[in-house]
């Protein structure tokens, strides 16, 4: 395939991305490597809660020390749960990538296109209202989506999505509203 070059003649680009997620204890989905398909437990809740209380702050310290920019796939309900995380993201001038409302639900929970469009709008409006600009990127909770999700994201103004781990470089996807950039997410190194 065609050689892919980055601006300035650079040959390599790296996307540093964290997933900052929130869950209500005992409600909705809660992935657990040890017990697939079982309801959420204190183990998978506390594992994720640790990330918001301790883990993300260690990442921020490391990113600051190494002077690395980052993008953060972030649930919109986090504004209610841990708004101090957004203060740190703003201070660092990092990018916020919309990541659904909560990882206790995903877009496959919404069977009708209109329902999914409302969820995308709700998430987008929450970020826009808090950050004064809409997020450019989207990664669905659990990287789940429906057959029309790329169409709905493009129609909602998104420039890229990260739900397709289909390549080692960005690719363009066709949608009914025009091209949408797919930035492949390395699912094989995700902590879940």
PLM features: residue spans?
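Catalytic alpha-helical scaffold of carbohydrate-active enzymes acting on polysaccharides/glycoconjugates
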Residues: 1-182, 187
């Amino acid at each position: 395939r065609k050689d892919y070059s980055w601006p300035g003649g650079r040959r390599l680009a790296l996307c540093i991305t964290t997933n900052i997620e929130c869950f209500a204890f005992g409600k909705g989905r809660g992935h657990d490597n040890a017990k697939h398909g079982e309801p959420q437990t204190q183990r998978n809740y506390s594992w994720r809660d640790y990330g918001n209380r301790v883990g993300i702050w260690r990442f921020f310290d490391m990113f600051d020390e190494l002077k690395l920019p980052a993008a953060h796939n972030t649930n919109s309900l986090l504004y209610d749960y841990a708004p101090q995380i957004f203060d740190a993201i703003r201070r660092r001038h990092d990018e916020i990538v919309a990541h659904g409302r909560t990882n206790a639900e995903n877009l496959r929970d919404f069977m009708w296109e209109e329902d999914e469009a409302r969820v995308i709008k709700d998430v987008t409006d929450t970020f826009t209202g808090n950050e004064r600009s809409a997020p450019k990127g989207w990664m669905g909770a659990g990287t789940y989506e429906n057959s029309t999700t790329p169409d709905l994201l493009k129609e909602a103004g998104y420039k890229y999505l990260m739900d397709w781990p289909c390549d080692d470089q960005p690719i363009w996807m066709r949608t009914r509203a025009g091209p949408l950039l797919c930035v492949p997410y390395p699912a094989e190194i995700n902590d879940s």
